[in-house]
């Protein structure tokens, strides 16, 4: 990283007046309908600031984007992270990225089985969408047979967990300062990954491989029942498959993995479709129908998701996403509503609501939403783009 900082400093001094300065400020307020299981407050607010510097030349791109977050209740949710800090060299059939970045793998809407490059910021939300920046070197080769991305990943990032004052957290305290690693190199181990992708008419396909420290730790006792749990990071290898097949207005999606290193080798998959009705009722509004199922060899339950997506296609980019998740084994139901709309040219307002319902049927099966049973909430988020 010191070498990268020197290169970037020289690059900045040589091109300081050609840079584009961007950024965003986000004000978030979450109102929980009930007092938390550990008597946490009902109202949680946060402020985040993400300045951004971007510069593009003929064969180079520089990108810098830190993120700062301050939470009103939970100190463990405070964040100072480099999301992007890299140089990208663009050649005729080759690209080389050196620095810190975020890489997304996946095609499904709800659970991204194959997305393993970056660590999840679990304090941002339980959906696993928000990630931390990952130091890396990435080489991309573009050939007639497809695109091959090869990664060397340095300086492992531990998963972020909410503290005792936080909401949407697990029902026990986790001490990440005492984390244990299977690898003798601990968080200094270099991980490796590769991903091949291509498209054939209506089919997009990707096959990936990862070898390194798992991004999903097991939580183990620390020796006493009244003490926090400790994250245990095992060394794994994982093969992944992504499929996206388009038939007119129908998109069929599959993500599947096979992983070894966390007990017996297991497989898991998310699969489903999204069908879009274009211009419903002779309007500009598109209505998408979403169905996704899940499978995991380790679990008896296979949650199913049914949702809709309304795209108004107006100049303010209004969208509404809603969905139900049903666990047929534990008999639990969850409901999610998300909507967003631009306010003028500089701002965005987003609303989100989450509700968890349990039938109280005692069938001795693990409860998917048990940790969040008192965490039904409504969130309003205001974003100002600099």
Give a label for each model feature.
Residues 25-31, 64-68, 98-100, 150-154, ...:
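Transmembrane beta-barrel strands of outer-membrane/channel proteins
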Residues 33-42, 73-81, 109-115, 161-167, ...:
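Outer-membrane beta-barrel translocator domains and adjoining extracellular loop/strand segments
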Residues 39-47, 78-83, 131-135, 142, ...:
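Residues that define the transmembrane beta-barrel architecture of outer-membrane proteins
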Residues 49-55, 84-89, 137-141, 194-198, ...:
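Residues on the lipid-exposed face of transmembrane beta-strands in outer-membrane beta-barrel proteins
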Residues 54-167, 201, 358:
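Outer membrane beta-barrel
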Residues 58-63, 93-96, 145-148, 202-205, ...:
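Repeated loop/turn-to-beta-strand initiation elements of outer-membrane beta-barrel proteins
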Residues 247-327:
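Detector for outer-membrane/organellar transmembrane beta-barrel domains
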Residues 273, 355, 372-386:
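Outer-membrane beta-barrel "beta-signal"
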């Amino acid at each position: 990283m010191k070498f990268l900082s020197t290169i970037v400093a020289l690059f900045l001094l040589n091109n300081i007046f050609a840079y584009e300065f961007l950024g965003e400020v986000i004000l978030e307020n979450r109102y929980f309908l009930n007092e938390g299981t550990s008597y946490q407050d009902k109202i949680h607010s946060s402020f985040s600031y993400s300045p951004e510097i971007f510069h593009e030349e003929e064969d180079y791109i520089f990108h810098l984007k830190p993120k700062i977050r301050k939470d009103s209740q939970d100190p463990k949710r405070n964040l100072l992270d480099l999301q992007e800090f890299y140089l990208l060299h663009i050649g005729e059939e080759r690209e080389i990225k050196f620095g810190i970045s975020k890489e997304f793998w996946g095609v499904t809407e709800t659970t991204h089985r194959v997305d393993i490059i970056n660590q999840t910021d679990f304090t941002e939300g339980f959906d696993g969408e928000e990630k931390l920046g990952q130091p890396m070197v990435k080489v991309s080769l573009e050939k007639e047979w497809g695109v091959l991305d090869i990664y060397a990943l340095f300086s492992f990032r531990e998963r972020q967990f909410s503290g005792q004052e936080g909401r949407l957290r697990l029902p026990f305290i986790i001490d990440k300062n005492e984390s244990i690693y299977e690898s003798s190199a601990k968080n200094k181990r270099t991980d490796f990954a590769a991903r091949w992708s291509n498209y054939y008419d209506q089919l997009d396909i990707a096959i990936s491989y990862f070898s390194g420290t798992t991004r999903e730790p097991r939580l183990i006792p620390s020796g006493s029942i009244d003490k926090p749990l400790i994250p245990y990071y095992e060394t794994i290898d994982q093969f992944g498959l992504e499929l996206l097949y388009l038939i007119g207005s129908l998109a069929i999606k599959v993500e599947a993995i096979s992983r070894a290193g966390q007990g017996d080798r297991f497989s898991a998959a998310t699969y489903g479709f999204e069908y879009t009705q274009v211009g419903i009722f002779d309007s500009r509004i598109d209505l998408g129908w979403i169905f996704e199922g899940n499978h995991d060899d380790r679990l008896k339950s296979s949650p199913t998701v049914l949702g809709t997506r309304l795209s108004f296609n107006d100049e303010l980019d209004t969208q509404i996403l809603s969905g139900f998740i049903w666990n047929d084994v534990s008999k639990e139901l969850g409901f999610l509503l998300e909507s967003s709309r631009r306010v003028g040219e500089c701002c965005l307002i987003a609303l989100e609501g989450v509700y968890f319902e349990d039938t109280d049927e005692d069938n001795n099966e693990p409860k998917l939403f048990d940790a969040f049973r008192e965490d039904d909430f409504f969130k309003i988020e205001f974003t100002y783009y600099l």
